[in-house]
A protein has these predicted regions:
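Alpha-helical protein-protein interaction modules
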Residues: 4-139
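Conserved short S/T/G-enriched processing/targeting/catalytic segments and their helical context
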Residues: 1
Length: 139
């Protein structure tokens, strides 16, 4: 960063790196700086945002960015994350709906132990807590 603080990819990569140290607000600052400097590639830079917001325990921010990603690049992971977000936010019925959709799309995941194998480490606690609240069985 010291060599080229105005390079968008450097800001993005630095933001990713400092998430490993729990510096989520600083990471967001660098990622949003990359987006501002290189708006044509914003979708590439935004993919990490749902994870950072979940890691922060910010359900509202996570929900915004999961919906954005789901609209742009549909994938089963987003149904699981929506289940976790809504579970943590207390909307258990909606969490259960998203969990059912996720499990239908991912038959290899039947319980918490299965999901722990694929959950992103950065936001594991938030996601697992939300999925438990949504009703993902322990075994």
């Amino acid at each position: 960063m010291e060599l080229n603080p105005n390079h968008p990819a450097c800001n993005h990569d630095y933001g990713l790196a400092i998430t490993n140290h729990g510096r989520f607000d600083d990471a967001l600052e660098h990622i949003f700086k990359a987006i501002k400097m290189d708006p044509a590639r914003h979708r590439n830079y935004e993919t990490i945002l749902p994870l950072i917001y979940m890691a922060k325990g910010d359900g509202e921010g996570a929900l915004k960015w999961v919906k954005e990603q789901l609209e742009y690049r549909p994938h089963s992971r987003y149904q699981g994350w929506l289940a976790a977000i809504h579970g943590n936010e207390g909307d258990i019925e909606l969490a259960k709906t998203h969990l059912a959709s996720f499990l239908e799309q991912r038959p290899e995941i039947t319980n918490q132990a299965d999901y722990e194998k694929v959950v992103p480490t950065i936001c594991k606690d938030f996601v697992m807590q939300g999925l438990v609240l949504a009703g993902l069985p322990a075994t």
